[in-house]
Amino acid sequence: MATLKPVMPSAASISISRRRWLRTTAATAAGALLSPLAQAAPRPGSLPREFRAAWMATVFNLDWPASPGLSPAEQQAQLIAQLDAAARLHLNALIFQVRPSGDAVYPSSLEPWSGFISGATGRSPGYDPLKFAVTEAHRRGLELHAWFNPFRARASKSHGPAGNHLATRHPEWTRSYGGGLWFDPGEPGVRQHTIRVIADVAQRYAVDGIHIDDYFYPYPPKGTSGMGASPFPDDATYARYGRGRDRAAWRRSNVNAFVSEMYAAVKKIRPSAKVGISPFGIWRPGVPTSIKGKLDSYEHLGADARTWLASGWCDYLSPQLYWSINPPDQSFATLLPWWHQQNRSGRHLWPGMAIDRIGAQRPAREIINQLALTRESAPRGRAGACHWALKGLRQNRGGIQEALLTGPYASRAAVPASPWLGAAIPEPPRAVCEGGILRIIPAADTRWIAVQTWDELEWQLAALLPPDMDSPMATIESRVPDNARRLALRTLSASGLESEALMVEIA
């Protein structure tokens, strides 16, 4: 192999042979001459950035698998089809539900296997779905965020608790409410157990994010206007721990303790993992003043999401803004800027959007318009959205696929950087092209290799290539995109920061 040849940083470009390893260095001065390639293809600007995620639910088999108890081969084929669909739509993240109801979509010593996967709580499906999902998502340039329901104990009577389910081991920590079984957030042991479960996944899996949904204290049963009409049965817990405080304030303090301690636990184990929360989209009725509604998530669910965002107890907040831009009672266009105003910590704000509500009364154009508003309201390079859910995208409701691919998702984008998770700018990769195969040696702290191609008009993000998680400095091989003559390669760090570009011409 040829000796490593230093070349100019991405302020310049170079034409490379098919058998020459290349690297960029910081040693060359800014006044160095550009090569003919640099004159023909301008230096690419910063990578396009936008968070494009979809929730992928396992509870009730909403997204995956199609039914409980399928063979590993059937489940894996279905999961690959889901991931392929996400990649074709130019998404860059999936929020994959791994804890539907005090159970696990992965082997765990803390909780039983989920019956939604294997057909019976506690029964193994014969493989590790989370490990498979992480590996296959990364192969497609997709982040994988592990999604936990923090306090639901049983979501379906068809899958009763197994012997090692927390509800079986500690029935005194559970409460029947609204037809379901719930862990009481006021019990310190419940909060500690849930944090241990989340920390265990952060420790054992190369997940890109940890995601908590909107079920804190449970929603009031249908047909009631709030907790006052059908109170959550936590009298005994309140008597032990409430210390005379207002009960709603005490409940909020329990949830706040869970959120802040969970965030700290994840950061201690996997600092670069993005912690996301997706609360109910209206903080309180009347806030802002034009917003109306019966449910008060602050009062009824113990969810003070404004405090979580302002305190920096999450890396991204995805309030579920499932309403249309019009009419004004729950207007997306009113709620989104209000949430941005609460973001004093400078975290990401990536609202949830309701793909499943596309229909006769809500065309796909509504989602396109909402995406335009998210781009207008977010700082440059920080926009994003989470789509509920992947199933609606795959079903192409209202022609949403075509609307996205001919509009806001026409080209790929990388996930926005989170510089508070690591501020060091990474070094560029090294590379050689031989026989149509691009071989890349990653730099230290590489999370992705971004490959851009020049189409004679503009630079396009062609791929995000992951390093080998077991051997992060191992050579990455990738076929050169068809008809590509010029490439730009960048390192993306664990926090999403990008290196200078290594400019490559395919001779």
Mark where each language-model region is.
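N-terminal export signals
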Residues: A2-I14, R20-A40
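Catalytic domains of carbohydrate-active enzymes, especially glycoside hydrolases
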Residues: A77-G102
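Active-site neighborhood of glycoside hydrolase catalytic domains
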Residues: R204, G223-P279, W283-V287, E299-H300, ...
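Beta-strand-rich modules
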Residues: P481-S495
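Substrate-binding cleft of secreted/luminal carbohydrate-active enzymes
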Residues: Y316-I325, R347-V415
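Aromatic- and acidic-residue-enriched segments that line the glycan-binding/catalytic groove
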Residues: Y106-S118, R152-Y177, D214-R240, P288-L295
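Active-site-adjacent "subsite" loops/lids of carbohydrate-active enzymes
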Residues: N61-E74, F151-D200
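Conserved aromatic anchor
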Residues: I437-A443
